[in-house]
C-alpha cells in the first residue's frame, strides 16, 4: 500500500497503480475534526481500525487536557499573532493553522482580513493594521536557500513594522514549521507548541 495525498501528482499516482500497487489517497485536513477522520480512515486502510481509534482517543484526551489549561485565559487577555512564511504573512481564515491557533486560544490576526481576491498573500499594510502582539516566524530551510536569521533581521528592521506591537515589544517567536504544516495526529503537538510559544506562563514547571 502506498499512501499519498490528494495533492499528489496524478501521473505519479497512475504510474504506481499501473505497476499493480494499491494507492490510498489521504485527505488534506483543514481542521482538527478532519484530522481525526483522516487518522481513522487511514487506520482502516491499513487494516488497523482499532489502533486508529485508539490513536484518535489519545488525541482527544490530550486536547481536552490542554483545553482545561487554556480555558483559564480570559477573552480580553488573548494574544493576537501574525504568522509568516518566507514570502508574507500567512494563515487565512479556514486554513489549518487558523484552526490550530484558535484551538490554542490565540487570535489569528490574518483571519480578520477580508480575502476579496482569494489569495494567500498578505501585504505589509494589512499586517500593520492588524497590529499583532506577536510575530511567528518560519524555521524550515526547505531548499537550503532560506536565510532564517537574515529573515528575522529584515522583519525586525523593516520600517513598515516599526510601530507594530510585536516589534516594539520584541515579541518575535519561532514555532517549528513541522507544526505549521502538520498532516497527522501530531496536530495535538502543534496546538500545544503554539500555546507554549504565546502563553509560556501557563506551562511553567512543565517539561518541554
Residue ranges and their predicted role:
Residues 11-85, 89, 110-111, 167-208:
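Extracytoplasmic substrate-binding proteins
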Residues 61, 65, 119-122, 156:
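Short, conserved clusters of charged catalytic residues that mark active-site
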Residues 89-93, 99, 137, 144-145, ...:
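Short, solvent-exposed loop/turn elements at domain surfaces
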Residues 96-119, 174:
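His/Asp/Glu-enriched short active-site or ligand-binding loop at hydrolase and phosphoryl-transfer sites
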Residues 155-173:
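Short glycine/proline-rich, acidic loop/turn segments that cap or connect secondary-structure elements
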Amino acid at each position: 500500500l502506498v499512501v499519498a495525498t490528494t495533492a499528489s501528482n496524478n501521473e505519479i499516482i497512475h504510474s504506481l497503480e499501473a505497476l499493480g500497487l494499491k494507492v490510498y489517497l489521504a485527505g488534506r485536513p483543514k481542521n482538527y475534526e478532519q484530522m481525526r477522520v483522516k487518522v481513522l480512515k487511514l487506520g482502516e486502510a491499513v487494516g488497523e481500525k482499532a489502533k486508529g481509534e485508539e490513536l484518535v482517543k489519545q488525541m482527544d484526551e490530550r486536547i481536552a487536557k490542554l483545553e482545561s489549561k487554556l480555558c483559564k485565559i480570559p477573552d480580553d487577555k488573548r494574544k493576537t499573532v501574525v504568522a509568516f512564511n518566507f514570502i508574507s504573512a500567512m494563515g487565512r481564515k479556514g486554513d489549518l493553522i487558523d484552526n490550530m491557533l484558535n484551538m490554542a486560544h490565540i487570535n489569528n490576526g490574518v483571519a480578520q482580513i477580508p480575502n476579496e481576491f482569494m489569495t494567500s498573500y498578505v501585504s505589509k499594510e494589512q499586517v500593520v493594521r492588524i497590529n499583532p502582539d506577536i510575530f511567528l516566524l518560519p524555521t524550515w530551510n526547505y531548499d537550503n536557500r532560506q536565510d532564517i536569521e537574515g529573515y528575522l533581521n529584515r522583519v525586525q528592521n523593516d520600517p513598515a513594522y516599526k510601530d507594530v506591537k510585536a516589534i516594539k515589544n520584541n515579541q518575535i517567536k519561532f514555532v517549528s514549521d513541522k507544526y505549521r504544516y502538520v498532516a497527522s495526529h501530531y496536530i495535538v503537538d502543534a496546538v500545544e507548541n503554539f500555546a507554549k510559544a504565546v502563553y509560556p506562563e501557563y506551562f511553567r514547571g512543565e517539561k518541554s
